[in-house]
């Protein structure tokens, strides 16, 4: 009698913050339901079981999702396209736009001011996205000096740290409350399913099947 082969373990990285609430129903549609302790707000655990014994979830910062997956510590993850673009890891494959977590990455500056234009060769920008920001300005012939901040970008112009900021914008309310105005949209952002390329090739029984289930779930939701 042949023994039943157990599926290979899969680690799935999901982000804390704005995308998580929208990601949970999507996970449920592909048959992945977190264990009860995942929803315990007092828990400091970072690794959680699911209803599928071979699949575990890790809940980490959005920027760390890409790093865990790119280096093979997790096989799959969910993260915003802003993070995928910022790191541009060659080891990452982003096969499915999940259609959630919509916002935009924008350039903003003081109300009444103009965006950088022709004739300007240098600008100082406060941002969480230095690589993306430099690329965007370089395409316009402007050298961007990026001040890396992980939060409170909106006060940088007021305190003289930078003339502009590049940050995620949803409603724009935070900009208005800090006397800033959105000047240019750099990119539209949505959440993506990301996969470690090596895991996609080596775990051919499980990982590609999960990718297809996500693709189907997104298609069904859009229908």
Curated annotation (Swiss-Prot):
The keyword Glycosyltransferase applies. It catalyses: 1-(5-phospho-beta-D-ribosyl)-ATP + diphosphate = 5-phospho-alpha-D-ribose 1-diphosphate + ATP. Its main location: cytoplasm. Keywords: Amino-acid biosynthesis, ATP-binding, Cytoplasm, Glycosyltransferase, Histidine biosynthesis, Nucleotide-binding, Transferase. InterPro entries: ATP_PRibTrfase_cat (IPR013820), ATP_PRibTrfase_CS (IPR018198), ATP_PRibTrfase_HisG (IPR001348), ATP_PRibTrfase_HisG_short (IPR024893). One of its GO terms (biological process) is L-histidine biosynthetic process. Its EC number is 2.4.2.17. It is an enzyme of class 2 (transferase). Heteromultimer composed of HisG and HisZ subunits. Lacks the C-terminal regulatory region which is replaced by HisZ. Belongs to the ATP phosphoribosyltransferase family. Short subfamily. NCBIfam families: hisG. This is ATP phosphoribosyltransferase. It comes from Sphingopyxis alaskensis (strain DSM 13593 / LMG 18877 / RB2256). The gene is hisG.
């Amino acid at each position: 009698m042949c023994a039943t082969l157990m599926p290979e373990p899969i680690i799935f990285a999901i982000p804390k913050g704005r995308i998580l609430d929208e990601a949970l129903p999507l996970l449920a549609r592909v048959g992945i339901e977190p264990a009860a302790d995942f929803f315990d707000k007092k828990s400091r655990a970072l690794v959680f079981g699911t209803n599928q014994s071979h699949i575990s979830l890790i809940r980490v910062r959005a920027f760390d999702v890409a790093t865990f997956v790119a280096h093979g510590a997790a096989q799959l993850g969910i993260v915003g396209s802003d993070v995928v673009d910022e790191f541009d890891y060659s080891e990452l494959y982003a096969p499915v736009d999940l259609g959630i977590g919509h916002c935009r990455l924008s350039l903003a500056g003081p109300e009444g001011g103009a965006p950088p234009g022709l004739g300007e060769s240098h600008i100082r920008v406060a941002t969480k996205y230095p690589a993306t920001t430099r690329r965007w300005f370089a395409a316009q012939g402007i050298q961007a000096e990026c001040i890396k901040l992980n939060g409170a970008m909106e006060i940088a112009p007021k305190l003289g740290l930078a003339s502009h900021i590049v940050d995620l914008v949803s409603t724009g309310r935070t900009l208005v409350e800090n006397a800033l105005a959105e000047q240019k949209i750099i990119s539209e952002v949505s959440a993506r399913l990301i996969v470690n390329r090596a895991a996609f090739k080596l775990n051919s029984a499980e990982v590609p099947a999960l990718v297809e289930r996500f693709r189907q779930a997104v298609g069904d939701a859009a229908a």
